[in-house]
């Protein structure tokens, strides 16, 4: 993959007023309670391909996720903020409303340790808002059920 810093990547990412299937809805820098602030995996993968071999990995099993990580391929997974239970709210999406996950959060998985059954997580939000480590290990028993809520993911090969 091409070298690009996070700020440049986020600044150039496609944006959309409200639809995460068309681009990042809202701002990647500021929370906005009125919008579903995210970008869906297919659009993120499409954008990411300009930097390297990136693919929408949504719908894949936990075992497939682990295989990618054990092959050295990082994977963006959509889980929940602070690993909390999922909760939902209704958002205006143009001319209609949709009930969507409210506490959505995306993190980068950098590895998997099959001996400890833990994932190596890169989470810049963890530093900014919690004063915690950028990289940390998360138990599979916490991560996997949250991944399986939607099975949204993007792999970088």
What are these regions (language model features)?
Residues 75-79:
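A short, Trp-centered hydrophobic/proline-enriched beta-strand micro-motif
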Residues 73, 103-105, 117:
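Envelope-exposed proteins and targeting segments
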Residues 85, 89-101, 110-157:
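Noncatalytic regulatory segments and standalone regulatory/sensor domains
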Residues 1-65, 70-73, 151:
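Cysteine-nucleophile protease catalytic domains, especially the papain-like/related folds used
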Residues 14-19, 60-63, 81-85, 114-115, ...:
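Solvent-exposed loop/turn segments at secondary-structure junctions
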Residues 62-63, 94-95, 106-107:
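A generic local structural motif
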Residues 57, 101-104:
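Short, glycine/acidic-rich beta->alpha junctions
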């Amino acid at each position: 993959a091409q070298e690009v810093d996070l700020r440049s990547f986020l600044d150039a990412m496609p944006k959309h007023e409200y639809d995460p299937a068309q681009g990042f809805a809202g701002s990647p820098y500021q929370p906005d309670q009125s919008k579903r602030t995210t970008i869906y995996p297919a659009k993120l993968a499409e954008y990411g391909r300009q930097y390297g071999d990136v693919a929408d990995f949504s719908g894949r099993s936990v075992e497939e996720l682990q295989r990618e990580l054990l092959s050295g391929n990082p994977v963006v997974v959509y889980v929940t903020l602070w690993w909390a239970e999922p909760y939902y709210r209704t958002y205006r999406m143009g001319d209609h409303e949709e009930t969507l996950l409210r506490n959505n959060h995306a993190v980068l998985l950098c590895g998997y340790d099959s001996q400890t059954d833990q994932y190596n997580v890169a989470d810049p939000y963890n530093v900014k808002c919690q004063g915690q480590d950028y990289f940390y290990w998360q138990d599979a028993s916490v991560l996997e059920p949250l991944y399986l809520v939607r099975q949204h993911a993007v792999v970088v090969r």
